[in-house]
Amino acid sequence: LGKAPTTDDLKKLSPNEIHLTIKNLNAGYGKMEILHNFDLLVNKAQSLCLIGPNGAGKSTILHSIYGFTNIFSGQIEIEGKEITNLSPAEKLKSVGIAYILQDNSVFPDMTVEENLLMGGYIKDKTDESYEEAERIFEKYERLRNRRNQPAKVLSGGERRLLEISRALVMKPSVLLV
């Protein structure tokens, strides 16, 4: 009780195929270090929920994985490939990391369809994106009925659905929410 789990403890919790590995990560914003010797192992197809009080470092962990923080030391890997110092765009293209921001990230003046297709443009796979977008429109009538309208007409819940759908169009191997 009261101590952080060791890497061996984490391996016992994630004995299968490790997808995401964080080793001895020291990261933060500017010169301020928020994470100190942080370790994490996540299996392929595993979901993980970070729970803790305000200021505990949950967002900093996600930001570090995606590339929004300064990494002072340590390593982040996806299936054994080091990605620690890659840009967010490189992480998306090379290992498939997508991030849904906490705040609204819908482009209000673009149509629902244009918003949905943005994920594919970022990943340079527009043909696949059109197919995925059609699949999403088939599944979600609310988005389908507004596909040619500006996204600003969507309710808060519909905007969140659009953000999540846009991330899924990219077919990420890691989805940070």
What are these regions (language model features)?
Residues 30, 110-131, 139-141:
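ABC-type ATPase nucleotide-binding domains, specifically the catalytic core motifs of the NBD
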Residues 51-53:
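The feature captures the beta-strand-to-loop junction immediately N-terminal to the Walker
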Residues 66:
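Helix-to-loop junction immediately C-terminal to a conserved catalytic motif
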Residues 74-82, 93-94, 128-133, 138:
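Conserved ABC transporter NBD signature motif
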Residues 150-154:
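Conserved ABC ATPase signature
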Residues 171:
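Conserved catalytic motifs of ABC-family nucleotide-binding domains
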